[in-house]
Regions:
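DNA major-groove recognition helix of helix-turn-helix/homeodomain DNA-binding modules
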Residues: 59-76
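Residue-level detection of the helix-turn-helix DNA-binding "recognition helix"
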Residues: 23, 37-38, 53, 82
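Short alpha-helical DNA-recognition segment
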Residues: 26-50
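Phospho-regulated, low-complexity intrinsically disordered regions of nuclear gene-regulatory
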Residues: 77-83
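A short, Lys/Arg-rich alpha-helix, primarily the initiator
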Residues: 1-25
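Helix-turn-helix DNA-binding elements, focusing on the entry/boundary residues of the two helices
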Residues: 18, 29, 45, 60-63
Length: 83
């Protein structure tokens, strides 16, 4: 059986980490999307919102832009959140 969602129904496992790191940098979703666009990734505020909420899949190519934009590594994006 092929499973493409997390146990809580999310379409990605790093959206919550992306949101936390973005907030720690005091970036709005719009400002983060703008930063990614300047780096060459075609995303908008709505795409960021859907990634962070788990409604959207995130490709490895997108992660290769997102990680440096958040001053982190792709590996760190997959680390569990400390609650």
């Amino acid at each position: 059986m092929f499973i493409n969602k997390t146990v809580d129904g999310r379409n990605n496992i790093c959206g919550l980490r992306i949101a936390a790191l973005r907030r720690s940098l005091k970036l709005s979703q719009r400002a983060f999307a703008d930063k990614l666009q300047l780096m060459g990734l075609d995303v908008d505020k709505n795409a960021i919102q859907r990634m962070e909420s788990g409604q959207r899949f995130i490709t490895d190519i997108e992660l290769s832009y997102i990680a440096p934009a958040l001053n982190t590594t792709m590996q760190e994006l997959f680390a569990p959140l400390d609650h």
